[in-house]
């Protein structure tokens, strides 16, 4: 308990230093709840608290409370186990950083809806950041039209999730395409998927390793 109090006091002293790029984060244990504004750098200071088995909560742009799943040097992954799975990756703090929120529905095939937000204002910038990809982007060249039609019928919708730094184009996280498919369908589709995939970002191509 003493350690928890010291951590909370230290975090409270940090909030003024990072007031320009704040995030609303909830620290919660079995007996108490404290809401403090922090940014990404402060988030990294929560590592000890996280590793101690405590739960750290944040709020998504649509005000849903989610538990932070992991904290790394490059991004913070937050998720919640509800009917839908919401994941967000925070780019490094800055005026042109983005938050990418993916909502994955447990349908067959699983479907992810993606929205991108400015990390500071939370303005929706999805159309400015992403060029949508379709199943055609992932089917290998040389696949016959008949086979393409068969694959599209089997997988009627496909959303691919990427998190990028809007200023550098650095890819912070991604869902592999085939994770959107039921396993039995993927086994049939796998031979027809391209080995390398490309993310089209504002007219530029970024190759993603398989």
Regions found by a protein language model. Give the residues of each.
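Short aromatic loop motif centered on NTY/YTY
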Residues: 125-203, 208-210
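Short, surface-exposed coil-to-beta transition loops
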Residues: 83-86, 99, 109-114, 155-159, ...
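Short beta-strand elements that form the blades of beta-propeller/WD-repeat-like
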Residues: 96-106, 169-176
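Terminal domain-start segments
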Residues: 20-92
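Mid-length scaffold segments of soluble, non-membrane domains
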Residues: 98-130
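Short, solvent-exposed loop/turn segments at conserved positions within beta-propeller repeat blades
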Residues: 59-61, 69-71, 108-110, 189-193
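Sec-dependent N-terminal signal peptides
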Residues: 4-13
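Sec/Tat signal peptide C-region and signal peptidase I cleavage site
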Residues: 14-19
């Amino acid at each position: 308990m003493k350690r928890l109090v010291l951590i909370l006091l230290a975090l409270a002293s940090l909030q003024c230093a990072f007031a320009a790029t704040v995030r609303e984060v909830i620290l919660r244990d079995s007996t108490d709840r404290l809401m403090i504004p922090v940014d990404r750098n402060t988030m990294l200071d929560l590592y000890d608290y996280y590793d101690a088995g405590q739960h750290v909560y944040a709020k998504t742009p649509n005000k849903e409370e989610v538990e932070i799943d992991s904290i790394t040097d490059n991004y913070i992954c937050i998720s919640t186990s509800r009917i839908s799975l919401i994941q967000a990756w925070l780019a490094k703090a800055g005026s042109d950083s983005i938050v990418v929120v993916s909502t994955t529905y447990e349908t067959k095939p699983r479907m992810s809806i993606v929205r991108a937000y400015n990390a500071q204002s939370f303005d929706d910038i999805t159309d400015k950041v992403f060029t949508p990809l379709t199943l055609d982007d992932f089917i290998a060249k040389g696949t016959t039209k008949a086979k393409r039609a068969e694959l599209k019928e089997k997988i009627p919708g496909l959303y691919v999730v990427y998190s990028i730094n809007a200023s550098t184009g650095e890819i912070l996280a991604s869902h592999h395409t085939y994770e959107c498919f039921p396993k039995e369908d993927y086994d049939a589709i796998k031979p027809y998927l391209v080995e390398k995939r490309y993310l089209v970002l504002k007219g530029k191509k970024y190759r993603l390793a398989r």
